[in-house]
Structures are given as structure tokens and as C-alpha cells.
Amino acid sequence: MNPDRIFEEFPAPSYRGNQKQALRDIRDAFAAGNDVVLVRAPTGSGKSLLARSVAGCARPAGEADPSDATGAYYTTPQVSQLDDVAADDLLADLNVIRGKSNYTCILPDERNTPVNQAPCVRERGYDCSVKHRCPYFSDRAIASNRSIAAMTLAYFMQTAGSEVFRKRDVVVVDEAHGLAEWAEMYATIQLGPRTVPFWDDLRVPAIDGDLERAVRYCENLAEKCTRRKDDLLAQETLSPAEVRERDRLQELIGELDWFVSDYRDPGSPTTWLVDQSEPSGGSSVGDGDGDGGVDGDGGGGGGDEDGGPLTIKPMSPEKYLQHTVWDRGNKFALLSATILNKAAFCRQVGLDPDNVALVDVGHTFPVENRPLYDVTQGKMTYEHRSETTPKIARTIVRIMQEHPDEKGLIHAHSYDIQERLADLLRDFGVGDRIRTHDRDDRDADLEAWKATDDPDVFISVKMEEALDLKGDLCRFQVLCKAPFLNTSDSRVAHRLEEGQWAWYYRTALRTVIQACGRVVRAPDDYGATYLADSSLVDLFERARTDMPDWFAAQVDRMDRPDLPEFEPRAAVGDSSGVSRGRGTGARSSPGSPSRRDDDSTTASSNSNSGSGSGSGSGSASRSHSRSRSGSGSRSGTGSKSSPLADVWDTER
């Protein structure tokens, strides 16, 4: 790597904001001998351009010995970020490669067939006459032979050990703040009816937290998967369904072998946890947010030893990251707005802090253009939610009145909260401005909301990251709940039992900072963020030492706004001559609702004090979009001094 090339590799015709200083600091950090440079760059600083400059410093093939690594990888965990890179003319020399399922076959009778189910993977010995024109293999060949290959983090990790995508000189990871969590997610093994093709034929033992028993079961399951895969490989032709089964079996065998070998390795730093659901014939299990085991069959057999679907989770994925990331390059640049604590981040991902430098990029957006407003109405923990949610709904109406001609985003945190808020807002009579989404259509519903010129308000779930809502796409947002991790998750509970509360609050703060960056995307842009859950204010106090200076400045300026009195008709343009057309009544410049509000009306919950039955439109589309039911009712201790008071049952 030659860091002195960093300025000539900058792809834009000119610098803006702090980009030139950032490049200077990154160059100096690599020149000082650091193997890894963390770049903490806030929203709007042009991280992708900085990333391209670093990638361009990689050793070129013409200056390398045959054994030397050359070129660079650019990778990001977010598909939308990779889409943005692919569409950016300034980043045209980042050669994007995606997974096979993103490409379709070009054979005449297979135009709608994904490449991963095309004849070349269905038929043994198939010789494709147009492989040289296949969109997947064409993109792969280009990406593997050009100086910068761009891909998602999932694809990057899956190609570890590949002869096509070998070790390179430089690896750039964009949006790297969640690297440890992504690694834990990718390394997690789900064994249930959605992930094991012949699950119904299995007898699953009750593990009862016995890791050794889980390992023995996984060894046996890997053998069964291998036999089934070999049977499929022996066939001359496979159906698309059999192709999917074969590929899944191959993936599953790799996962199981990795778990068994890592567990048997006495030098491995990884701690493994095993969760098990009830079999389908046992006690009822609520519909979950993500695991694939709620409708599983415990398998044949009988007696009291039958168990249900298994989730096997790594606690410390350092070894996994070593193989999938750190062995893939010589030098690394990790970019994000929210790498909040260098030492903690390095510890999580298995890096030596002595070989890591942190470069801070200053924020260039005026703090007055990105205000935070305290409209807290109480706690949104499970035990307080039925009381607090109607108050937040009333407050949202008043915020809509404050922004009659501007689009807004509501961060609901869970589908249960989303549904309750949507029902209450419809009951209040402002449903004409409300949009929601479900799990299946979230991207389509988001794009439809972004495309409309109406001042609609979108109630979202888990959209705190990877959204670019510049300008009039969104002028205000409301955070309805502190985004604490779910304490019923065994991985979270294990860390909290070890006293890792700083990690817990830092993770929530990271999500809040990411959310705040959705609505202000340029120095002359502006947007307001309203905080409705009182636990958010407490979070700021607990995690203050991990705040970047530019976000601490926002928190220090936070006050309570003077919102209009509760009048739902005014929120939809039916009162006081307010029009729903864009331009009249809209706030056209940064600033705030003027100072304090005694909150006498928001404190009232005299109407619709429940979650609302909500017979309005949209209820059918939300019928399957409930949040995770959890595994019991671990409510807070009630003591305000206890960290548990604000966090139990956060996903419900």
C-alpha cells in the first residue's frame, strides 16, 4: 500500500467539508505503520469518496511480485449502500459483484430463472454455451480481475478461501460499526423447519443447555446432510427445488463443521450459546421476529427427550472474523459515523488496539439545522407501554400540526408499537396522513412514501440506518422508543450477566445516532428529531462518555418545543385554513417550535387510552407483523437506580 497516493486517488473534482483533512489524517495513520485505520466520519462527510481514495492506494499488479497481494476490496453490510455505490458515476471503477440469486439466466427458456437455479447448476456436466456472457460470471470475472472489487459483507465473508477472490492488499469496510454483530449473525446456526430440508424426519433431543450434547447432535446431523447431498449429486438432473436443497445442505454442512471444530479447539476464544424452542407438539410459541423454529416438528421418536428447533450462537466471533475478514487483506480501513469507542470496538472484533488508529472527521452540518426536541411522555418498557403509547400518539398529532406540509418518519422500534400507534392515529382522525409497512413489503412501501409529494407520515420499524432522506423527503422524525437490545436474547443476557452495561448502552446510543442522521444530509439541509421515550434521555446520561462531540452538541441544545394544542383536524388540513398543498404553512428554514411547552395536554390520555382496536384500513396487512413474543415476562425491578428498570422486554 502506498498511502501517499491518497489525494490523487480522490474521485471527486474538488473537496468539500473536511474531506481533505480527513485524507491527510488517514494517510498519516497508515504511514505511521498502522494495519487498521478506523475512520469516524459523520453523515454527509462523503465516506464513500474517502473509501475510494483509500482503496486506490493499494499495490497495483504492475508493481508487485507474483506472491504479493494486490488491489482492494470495498465491502459494506448494507445492500442499499452497495446500490448507491453502483449508481454513483464518481465510483464507476468500483466493480460490483452480487450473489448468484441477484442475476437471471440469459438462455432463451430460462429468462426468469435465477442463476443459482439455472441449467448449469441443475444438470450434471452441463456445458453452457453462453457462460462467457452470463451476467453473474461476467461481473465476477470483471470484479476479480480489476483493481477494486465491491460486494456486500455477506458475499465477502462467503468467499473466504475462494480461488477467485483471494487476499488483496487493502480492504475497505464501509458502515463498519456493526461488524461484530454482523459476524455473530452470519456465524449463528439456525436448525429448524425453514433451514433443515428434512427437519420433519429428524428426532431432535432436548439439549437443556448441554453444549456437549449439542455438538454430538450437530456431528450426527452433518453426516445425515452429507448423505442426502451426495444422493442429490448422484442424480443427472435436479429440479429447482432440489438445487435449493443441495445448496442449503452444503451451506449447512459448512456451518455445522465450523461449530464442531471451533468447539473442539481448546485454543478458540469463542463462547457458544444454544437456545432451544419447544417442539410444535409442545407448548405454544408466539410468532417470532426472526428465528425459523416456531413451527418446527420435534421429529419422530417420543418420550420426554424430544426438543424443538435450535439456535447456536457465538458470543465472541474473533476466530470467524479472522478467517472471513482479517486474513483477506494486508491493510484495512473501517468507516462509520458510529464507531463510538476504539478500545471496545477492537475488543469485539479481535483487533490489537496498538495496531489500530482512529481518525475523527469533524461534522460540517450546523448544529441548529439538526435539532433534538424533548417531547418525552414516559417510559416505553413493556409494563409502561399501554399507558405511554396513547400519550405519544397524541404528541405525534401535535408534531404533525407543527409540520402540516412536511413529510415525517416515525421510528416505532417494533411492529407491535407500529400497529398500536397506527390504530390510535386513525382513531384520532389523522389516518389520511399515515402510512405503514409490513415485513414483506417494507422496501416497496418505503419507496412509495418517498415518491409521494403529499406530506405523509411513515411509521417504520428498524429503519434507523441506510436511509437517505435528503431535503423534502423528510423534515421531521420521532423516536418512539429507546432502541435497547432485547434482553430475552441469550447473547444479550449473557453479556449483561457479565456486567457489560457500557456495551449495552453504547449499542443503543449507536442506533440513536444513526437514526438522527436520516433526515439531514447536507450542510444546507435541515430536519428535526423528536424524542418521545423518557428512557432516551436517560440513555444520553448513561452513555455520555461515548458520544462524538458533534452529537453531544446536539444533546446539549435539546429542549422542549412549544407545540400547538392538540387539534387533529389541523394535522390534516381541516382547520384554520391550513392546506395540505406543499408550500403554505410549511417551515421553510431551520429553527424550532419556539421554546418550552408545559405539556399539559400531552400528559393527558383521556381518549383511546388502550392500544386501540383500529378497524381502519391497513389492519389486514399488519395481521402477520407482530413483534417477538419473547420468553417470559422479565419486567423491571421498579428501582429507578437499577439499569434493568428501563430495558427489560424491549422487543415486545
Each PLM stretch: what is its role?
Residues 2-11, 15, 21-43, 65, ...:
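Conserved coupling segment at the C-terminus of the helicase ATP-binding
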Residues 47:
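Conserved lysine of the Walker
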Residues 376-385, 442-539:
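Conserved RecA-like P-loop NTPase helicase motor core
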Residues 127-169, 459-464:
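Conserved RecA-like ASCE ATPase "motif II neighborhood" in helicase/translocase motors
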Residues 137-147, 429-459:
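Conserved motor-coupling elements within RecA-like helicase/translocase cores
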Residues 98-103, 153-155, 412-416, 433-447, ...:
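Conserved helicase motor
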Residues 33-37, 52-92:
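Conserved SF1/SF2 helicase motif Ia
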Residues 484-514, 522-587, 594-597, 636-652:
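Helicase C-terminal subdomain and adjacent C-terminal extension
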